[in-house]
Amino acid sequence: MRVMGVDPGLTRCGLSLIESGQGRQLTALDVDVVRTPSDAPLSSRLLAINEAVEHWLETHRPDVVAIERVFSQQNVKTVMGTAQAGGVVALAAAKRGVEVHFHTPSEVKAAVTGNGTADKAQVTAMVTRILALQTKPTPADAADALALAICHCWRAPMIAQMAKAHALAEQQRRSYTAKLKAAR
């Protein structure tokens, strides 16, 4: 499975591509950070992110895109920019029929470090170790994008099992409801 991990942001948007093998074997294929000037109009910044993501989707053809879910921050402007960048990425993937999943920062930290409250240095160190990289990925947005892809690779089997369980439960609920109606 090829997973494109995205750490969304207007100033710096981290992009990564990881391929999963058997078990927990992972290979980093590419990583980059899209930068946009803070003084540029919002529409220009979002367009630059969209163009970079479109290029990545065309070049790398991921099976799934994993995006960091925006969480509450004190700076509303930062949250809005992050959400807008994430929306641009999700839309670009959806237009190509690529599955999109969102993961919270604590899910990513827990998957990569075993600690949902790990700091950036711990996440970067574990990403470097897990992927057997020669140097630490910089800036932090690159490491975070890799961590998102790792998280999804390792959580995907559980996500699939949960989806099957929910579908089965819904099917059984409908069957039971139909039997109740027939018995009346």
Curated annotation (Swiss-Prot):
One of its GO terms (cellular component) is Holliday junction resolvase complex. SUPFAM superfamilies: Ribonuclease H-like. It is found in: Cytoplasm. Its cofactor is Mg(2+). Keywords: Cytoplasm, DNA damage, DNA recombination, DNA repair, DNA-binding, Endonuclease, Hydrolase, Magnesium, Metal-binding, Nuclease. Binds 2 Mg(2+) ion per subunit. Pfam families: RuvC (PF02075). Belongs to the RuvC family. Homodimer which binds Holliday junction (HJ) DNA. The HJ becomes 2-fold symmetrical on binding to RuvC with unstacked arms; it has a different conformation from HJ DNA in complex with RuvA. In the full resolvosome a probable DNA-RuvA(4)-RuvB(12)-RuvC(2) complex forms which resolves the HJ. This is Crossover junction endodeoxyribonuclease RuvC. The gene is ruvC.
